[in-house]
């Protein structure tokens, strides 16, 4: 599978990586093979593209599905509804409202009558396929160019706190409303993660290795006293 989202216009607004950002991606060690072993995945999506390259594209994830019960709770019934939780991960150039509108139009094109509320009895009799789509507010992506003076200053500061060569990644995934700082405060942001890669983020036994904590303290101290 290529992992490509089939929704019309899903990638139209994407601002691609610059040559400098692509060069940064190809200059660092890639964890793809290690991740396949650790996660037990034979073949990831992307048609051979690197994980960090795929982070330059928006994604559409199915976070959860629910219908009738299974296992010991299974019953001889016909489910009256099926529920799916969808998650949109945006990149620079996307607008969360435009993206959700594209999703709704795509569902309509599959033959569904789309509502943002429960259907009336009359609508249930009129339409064979009904989809209730509830959209929760989101926020857009933000990316600071590697060529920005602040990015260069942070890179220098972080490198000064470590004897090892630091890894510079032009973009990471995460639920961080950084674009609000840029939009309303005209401020520039740079993310400096310190967690270990196997920290089970947002899951059971989420953790931070003590050495990462100590290193992080030194890293943030270097950033706090850097000249910019």
Regions found by a protein language model. Name each.
Residues 1-207, 211, 215:
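Metal-dependent amide/peptide-bond hydrolase catalytic core
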Residues 212-220, 224:
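Extended, hydrophobic alpha-helical segments in both membrane/secreted and soluble proteins
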């Amino acid at each position: 599978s290529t992992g490509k989202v089939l929704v019309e216009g899903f990638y139209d607004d994407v601002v691609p990586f610059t040559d400098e950002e692509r060069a940064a991606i190809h200059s660092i060690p890639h964890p793809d093979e290690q991740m396949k072993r650790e996660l037990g995945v034979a073949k990831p999506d992307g048609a051979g593209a690197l994980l960090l390259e795929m982070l330059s594209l928006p994604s559409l994830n199915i976070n959860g599905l629910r219908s009738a019960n299974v296992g010991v709770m299974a019953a001889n019934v016909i489910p009256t509804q099926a529920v799916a939780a969808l998650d949109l991960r945006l990149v620079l150039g996307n607008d969360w409202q435009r993206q959700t509108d594209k999703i709704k139009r795509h569902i309509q094109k599959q033959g569904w009558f789309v509502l943002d509320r429960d259907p009336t009895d009359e609508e249930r009799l009129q339409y064979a396929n009904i989809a209730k789509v509830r959209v929760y507010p989101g926020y857009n992506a933000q990316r600071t160019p590697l060529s920005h003076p602040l990015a260069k200053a942070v890179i220098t500061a972080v490198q000064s706190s470590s004897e090892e060569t630091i890894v510079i990644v032009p973009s990471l995934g995460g639920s961080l409303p950084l674009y609000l700082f840029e939009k309303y405060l005209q401020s520039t942001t740079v993310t400096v993660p310190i967690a270990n890669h196997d920290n089970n983020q947002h899951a059971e036994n989420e953790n931070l290795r003590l050495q990462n904590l100590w290193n992080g303290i030194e890293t943030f101290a270097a950033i706090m006293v850097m000249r910019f």
